[in-house]
Amino acid sequence: MKLQYTALAAAVVLALAACGKKAETTAPATGTAAAPAASGPAVAAGSAADVAAKKWIDSEFTPSTLSKDQQATELKWFVDAAAKLKAKGITEIAVVSETITTHEYESKTLAKAFEEITGIKVKHDLIQEGDVVEKLQTSMQSGKSIYDGWISDSDLIGTHYRYGKVMNLTDYMAGAGKEWTNPGLDLKDFIGTSFTTGPDGKLYQLPDQQFANLYWFRADLFAREDLKTQFKAKYGYDLGVPLNWSAYEDIAAFFTNDVKQIEGKPIYGHMDYGKKDPSLGWRFTDAWLSMAGTADIGIPNGKPVDEWGIRASADGCTPQGASVSRGGATNSPAAVYALTKYVDWMKKYAPKEATGMTFGEAGPVPAQGQIAQQIFWYTAFTADMTKKGLPVVNEDGTPKWRMAPGPNGPYWKQGMQNGYQDVGSWTFFTDHPADKTAAAWLYAQFVTSKTVSLKKTITGLTPIRESDIQSQAMTDLAPKLGGLVEFYRSPARVAWTPTGTNVPDYPKLAQLWWKNVAQAVTGEMTPQKAMDTLAEEMDDVMARLERAGMAKCPPKLNPKGDPAKMLTDKGAPWKKLANEKPKGETIAYQTLLDAWKAGKVR
């Protein structure tokens, strides 16, 4: 996802930061993880580095899954590695990321800590995500990186892999970067590396922060006996967490049209946004089509057809087309259904202002207390929605709401991607001064190290390490986070994934989505026409990439065929269902949590 921050969204960021600070003071330290196998003793007493390291360990880097001695040992490794780079004249580096709470914590706190402990100054710029992508594109085109390190969405993995401008970390850690790689890095502890791995099996990015897109609902309203009785009388099944889009639609209609008001204020059964704006594209590329069931079966992304509707060769290397006529699914019946439901629900069940809102403007609305459920909700809003005094928070600080897996459309099948997960990841250019890259790699490892990662997770609620997720500190926080900890502890989380490797040039293709979706919102185009146009434009871009060539695996479009003959019930593009609204299905929230613990996606 690409976040754009309006004034409203900036308030969300501030609230996230404030809530994170509150959490830090309540979570106890833990020492459950194994010590990093770093060479050398803990930092020797008396040195400036020792004083700085001890200060930060005692005052800031708590809780941690490491003991204080283990933290000191890990920091000693960073001090020694940095000393070798300083001897080569490296005293300062520049890195960049988007503006979310986690990265603000890195820029304002961890960069300062890194400088005090290692002596290398870090200029960690915070800019809008759209600007990160634009600057990244410019650097890729010129061949000169304007930063020593980048935190870039793993959505660009297919782009990075194919252009050959981004460093392959697997080979770097085994070769030129071996002496700069923390022995305690513990890659297996990272939960998102499958999302940053290319078709060649090599790691191209190191995860720095993650958040998922889930279903959000007012558990307190869903538990009201009068509403449960009223819903069952009308629909014939229990009011609960919707398992399919039919139930979501029924619940949306129920709250908007039947309940109408709660405590004298209007209540709506749905919330969304529809303004013609780049954020409208992310509303779809962040896996909306996969939730409907547009793609093929496959984790992390459908194979051979992914959630953008792009078909790739059997080895996942060569994109072959987005339109149904080329074997893709961007304008398939399932994709058209997904767009149709998005438009219909927003116009029928959301506040009337929703169609004119951007992502940043719509994000804070559920916290105001007049939304009963939202099918497309980012866990990055968790902390903002747990502030005391909000209409959606109890007096004891526990939320009145919960998060759950998003319901699935009628085309969805077991084994498909279930939803989206954002994975902001450290990215480095190949043709960049080696010592500058090494220093930036040190900083990247520092801000993701076990010494600091649990505190960072509590601050921004964007976990990257299994050891942090399983810590006592997160257990203690869980009751106030509305299901976030339970989700990330579930083996089922692997079905929430970022954009995959089928997408050959994310920036060029992503910009096509919002312009076409917007025309379906305004009614200038039917959903079918909008998706037909989008699919054709995607094929045109991939044809240009094919002609221009790419370092690895450029697109090679399939010849056009008869779309009707491409549709099948064996795989994507799926043929149109006779009934796109089966009976609604719901589940009790506690039963759902039990399924999560068992590793079931549903």
What do the predicted segments below correspond to?
Residues 77-79, 399-408, 458-521, 547-580, ...:
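Long, aromatic- and glycine/proline-rich binding clefts that accommodate carbohydrate-like moieties
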Residues 88, 112-189, 224-226, 230-232, ...:
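Extracytoplasmic "Venus flytrap"/periplasmic binding protein-like
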Residues 247-256, 290-356, 406:
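Glycine-centered hinge/linker elements that transmit conformational signals in sensory
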Residues 43-87, 154-214, 263, 400-405, ...:
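Hinge/lid segment of periplasmic solute-binding proteins
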Residues 77-84, 101-121, 216, 220, ...:
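Short, polar/charged alpha-helical segment
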Residues 197, 347-352, 361, 369-371, ...:
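Extracytoplasmic/periplasmic substrate-recognition and gating elements
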